[in-house]
């Protein structure tokens, strides 16, 4: 008799995705981050659901409702800090997942890669709107600054901003509409994840060597299920440690002050995971130019597959490209640091140099280095 998991209409979909899925035998721990992102998304949706039961999206009560969750709701503080730090963990896994894709040439699966870029935009939008909801000082001023960037769009910019605000500044209507969108977007993200996996399973996974692994496949279960569970345990331990020992480590102290439109914080900045893009935005004196650079800092990833000039897929056997990749990581860390600094000398010039280097590495140096490597290998 055939196993029910192979015949049942629903179970056979799960079976072909997580049980009998053929996977390359050489996948390293860098391939764990996809499943870790799935766990992060599940944690965020569950904690967010319970937080939404107690939260009120009204400017008069939003800040107090978050305080009420932390003080009066049973384990409400755990939910709140799991959700806030879960977002940080989500972005750590997300950036490592993208880095893995760049290093090992996974971007050559263009459909999967492009859906991934859409996912990144959706997750960033979700995180931004979530940051506004506690209605602290940084929530209010962050929302004001970031939404105001849309006014740089010629002709329709100001109308668009006021349409999003629901008034002439960030008001009650803005908070009220951000809440349902913040609630809805994670489910759209979950749907996009399904499409992402659908395209991935059309081609099968890449592997560290970048060489087709069709002759050497193993079943996903039990080999990679066990490996993924170990990853879950490590990540959840790290998240729990952060939540229980230093929940405010990655937050901004200004957000413990209720939003006040009359007092501007000395230094407005987004959450740490947006600082690299914020630094690129600030490095261009022109408003429209800055906004374009901000969008392109993410969209540039879509151009990477078109600029792949190497005869090899992975960087595993390409030391020059490896050096360039780690230089790119250093540039991104520098941008993250600069994004959190005030707009003054020498931070301005460091940010401008790092921004130029970021685009140069991805668009010029990497393709040229690949051509040099091909020549050195006489290909």
Swiss-Prot record:
Pfam families xrefs: Cytochrom_B_C, Cytochrome_B
Location(s), subcellular: Mitochondrion inner membrane
A Gene Ontology biological process term: mitochondrial electron transport, ubiquinol to cytochrome c
Superkingdom of origin: Eukaryota
UniProt: heme b b562 binding residues: 83, 182
Coarse class of the protein's main subcellular location: mitochondrion
Transmembrane segments: 33-53, 77-98, 113-133, 178-198, 226-246, 288-308, 320-340, 347-367
Chain sites annotated for binding a ubiquinone: 201
Entry note: cofactor: Binds 2 heme b groups non-covalently.
GO cellular component term of the entry, any: respiratory chain complex III
Entry's family note: Belongs to the cytochrome b family.
Functional description taken from the UniProt entry: Component of the ubiquinol-cytochrome c reductase complex (complex III or cytochrome b-c1 complex) that is part of the mitochondrial respiratory chain. The b-c1 complex mediates electron transfer from ubiquinol to cytochrome c. Contributes to the generation of a proton gradient across the mitochondrial membrane that is then used for ATP synthesis.
Subunit note: The cytochrome bc1 complex contains 11 subunits: 3 respiratory subunits (MT-CYB, CYC1 and UQCRFS1), 2 core proteins (UQCRC1 and UQCRC2) and 6 low-molecular weight proteins (UQCRH/QCR6, UQCRB/QCR7, UQCRQ/QCR8, UQCR10/QCR9, UQCR11/QCR10 and a cleavage product of UQCRFS1). This cytochrome bc1 complex then forms a dimer.
Miscellaneous: Heme 1 (or BL or b562) is low-potential and absorbs at about 562 nm, and heme 2 (or BH or b566) is high-potential and absorbs at about 566 nm.
Name this protein carries in UniProt: Cytochrome b
Lineage summary: Eukaryota, Metazoa, Chordata, Craniata, Vertebrata
